[in-house]
Design a protein with these regions (language model features):
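Sec-dependent signal peptide recognition
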Residues: 6, 15-21
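Short, positively charged and aromatic/hydrophobic N-terminal segments
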Residues: 9-11
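Hydrophobic h-region of N-terminal signal peptides that target proteins for export
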Residues: 23-31
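Predominantly soluble domains enriched in secretory-pathway, periplasmic, or organellar proteins
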Residues: 34-513, 517-522, 533-555, 563-571, ...
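Surface-exposed loop/edge segments in extracytoplasmic proteins
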Residues: 153, 584-590
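Enriched for extracellular/lumenal, surface-exposed ectodomains of secreted and cell-surface proteins
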Residues: 510-514, 616-622
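Edge beta-strands of extracellular beta-sandwich domains
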Residues: 516-525, 624-635
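Conserved aromatic beta-strand anchor motif in extracellular beta-sandwich/beta-rich domains
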Residues: 577-581
Length: 638
């Protein structure tokens, strides 16, 4: 038998390897194609195309514990014309069975999600938004305004090392930075998990925060009076390390950036200067004298100019041009200390708490065009597309200035945001107390003296509703909107993180025309995330929406069931119950009493109004307090 040639011996292994590589590439391509293959549903002349893919290129499919982008492309069935300006809603719910749900079951699921009851809630609500309050205590309240278990809208509390002074949220709503002056630290919060993931030592008394437009660096004011510790600390947002502590001048610092992030403008209150900083080199290029107390700074995209409010003499300085010099001075009155420039528009706004006036100036001509009287102690201004909102610390009334009427007889209206003036609260914050709501033409207003948040819609005489902050002073507000957004024409997207692997139903609803459908999503196991340990039992309240009266004994009845079979767990003698008042200022422990057929009972007297959590523990069931899902009870004043 002839021996194979040397050339054949060499080529055969190479061909085998090539075949293997091509096979692996084909498999990989198949997986990627499968992940990206859209699911399509057509009804009522509308075509909805759903895709889900991992946000990170590291993964080929959606995996537990990692972010994924959900995308709904909505077009007309005939011609594929993108349908824009729609308001689709969607929910994700983990499937309990292997079978796909029917169209009827899908409609019933959507209907249950639209109800306020918590008998049936989705794993993830893609229509929710959260209100965050920066409190007088060392914590942040997270409030779910659209729902609430047992009457409570408090979703969670984020503990801090000390009270927060200022905060800034990234554009993708995933990371929140909070300055903590009493701790000399910056807290870094992961929004999807509501956890503080890092605490960074950033020097003495960090107060004001400013995040560049590209979010590369976070700039922190170290307000240390006239001491040598007065500086600006710069943090790299990728490494979460301090890259520079820049000495610009003494006193309080306000910070603004040019649109391209090439320049930073920093006020130095005690030194009476503005520093112009080269961001790339992190070096001071120029110091500009301002006069007594440069109190605020803002950059205009329209005029490419930085404006500085000088409280000492009431001048608004305009810094611009290639040499970064003073190109105009706008005269107002001593005490001007707040600046606001809406994202679109031709005017800037300067507030004077001493004179209770707002000075409106033209960004093109750098001339004063109007002076508007407002409430006493006006210290903050916020904007919607139609109005400027002015908060006054000396009054519960918020002043509204119609932007379209600037330069004419300004249409000024007021509405009450509470019963008491904000100044009656002990602590204030530099962060905004008035923020736009997700709904157009609406705002949320924090009143720390009332311990309430008010929801106001333009055109109304009074707020349409309110949310309590559970005995905490809300000094500032943020809104985190998780709803679907139109990212391109006819494409509505959001980013989510599902921590548990499995199959999910993606319930979709379009109101007009009425389209309901349930798509499917598979979340794979993540080798980097430990599997969730399931408890052997589940506990369900007998009364789904429990409201107690403070000072009156309240009976809590609940069922203990086998998590897999649903069979009642009877005659448990070691079922320990822990009841505590959030945030842990009162608690009670007791053993539950069996009243038959897997139903147990305990009771307690709520000492005051608030949110109470009920946890369970049983040695015989291998259940610890931290493994049980708590029941939530709202206690109200009797």
């Amino acid at each position: 038998m002839a021996k194979p040639s040397r050339l054949f011996v060499i080529i055969l292994p190479m061909l085998n390897k090539l075949f293997l590589v091509l096979l692996l590439l084909a498999i990989g391509s198949s997986v990627r194609a499968q992940d990206k293959t859209p699911q399509t549903y057509n009804a009522e002349g509308v075509s909805i195309e759903f895709t889900a893919k991992p946000a990170s290129p590291e993964f080929r499919q959606v995996v537990a514990g990692e972010e994924a982008t959900l995308r709904f492309k909505i077009t007309g069935s005939n011609g594929g014309v993108p349908l824009t300006n729609l308001r689709p809603v969607a929910w994700l719910d983990q499937r309990q069975s292997k079978d796909s749900i029917t169209a009827r079951e899908c409609r019933e699921m959507v209907q249950s999600f639209l109800q306020p009851s918590f008998n049936k809630r989705p794993t993830l609500d893609l229509n929710a938004y959260f209100i965050l309050t920066l409190n007088n205590e060392p914590n942040i309240s997270v409030i779910d305004p659209l729902s609430g278990f047992g009457g409570s809208k408090l979703y969670t509390l984020i503990p801090l090392a000390s009270y927060g002074e200022d905060w800034v949220l990234t554009a993708d709503n995933k990371r929140l930075y909070v300055s903590m002056p009493a701790a000399n630290e910056l807290a870094v919060i992961d929004i999807p998990t509501w956890k503080v993931i890092d605490r960074i030592d950033v020097g003495a008394m960090p107060t004001r925060l400013a995040l560049q437009h590209d979010e590369r660096y976070l700039w922190i004011d170290n307000t240390a009076g006239s001491s040598a510790e007065s500086r600006v600390t710069i943090v790299d947002t990728v490494t979460l390390k301090v890259v520079k502590q820049l000495v610009t001048g003494l006193g309080h610092h306000e910070i603004a950036f040019s649109d391209d992030d090439r320049l930073a403008f920093i006020t130095n209150d005690e030194t009476r200067t503005v520093s112009v900083v080269d961001v790339r080199k992190l070096q001071v290029l120029k110091q500009i004298s301002t006069g007594i107390s440069p109190a605020a700074i803002a950059f205009s995209s329209l005029s490419q100019t930085a404006y500085v409010a000088v409280a000492g003499d009431g001048t608004i300085m305009a810094i611009g041009g290639p040499r970064h010099e003073v190109i105009a001075r706008i005269a107002t009155e001593p005490g001007v200390s707040v600046l606001g420039i809406p994202a679109t528009g031709h005017y800037g706004f300067a507030l004077n708490p001493k004179t209770s006036k707002v000075y409106v100036f033209d960004l093109s001509s750098n001339r004063l065009v109007q002076t508007v009287p407002v409430g006493p102690g006006s210290d903050q201004i916020s904007f919607t597309q139609q109005f400027a909102y002015v908060r006054s610390t000396g009054s519960e009334f918020v002043t509204m200035i119609k932007l379209a009427d600037i330069g004419k007889e300004a249409a000024v209206t007021k509405f009450p945001a509470g019963q008491r003036a904000p100044a009656e609260s002990a602590l204030s914050s530099h962060a905004a107390a008035i923020v736009p709501a997700p709904e157009d033409g609406s705002v949320l207003v924090a009143n720390p003296a009332d311990k309430m948040i008010y929801y106001y819609t333009e055109g109304m005489a009074v707020p349409m509703g309110s949310f309590q902050n559970y005995r905490r002073d809300p000094r500032a507000l943020l809104v985190i909107d998780n709803s679907l957004r139109e990212t391109t024409r006819g494409v509505y997207s959001t980013t989510v993180r599902l921590n548990t692997a499995g199959r999910y139903d993606v319930a979709f609803l379009l109101d007009s025309p009425r389209v309901v459908n349930c798509f499917e999503l598979t979340v794979a196991e993540n080798p980097n995330v430990p599997k969730k340990t399931e408890t052997a039992i589940k506990i369900e309240p007998v009364v789904k929406e429990a409201v107690a009266n403070a000072g009156t004994r309240f009976n809590v009845r609940f069922k203990v069931l086998d998590a897999k079979t649903g069979t009642a767990k009877t005659n448990l003698e070691d079922l320990n119950v822990l009841v505590f008042l959030s945030p842990g200022i009162w608690q009670q422990r007791d053993f539950a009493k069996s009243i038959g057929e897997g139903v147990y009972e305990t009771s307690f007297v709520p000492p005051s109004a608030g949110v109470y959590y009920v946890f369970f523990q049983s040695a015989s069931l291998g259940l610890q307090f931290n493994q049980s899902t708590p029941l939530t009870i709202q206690a109200v004043k009797n």
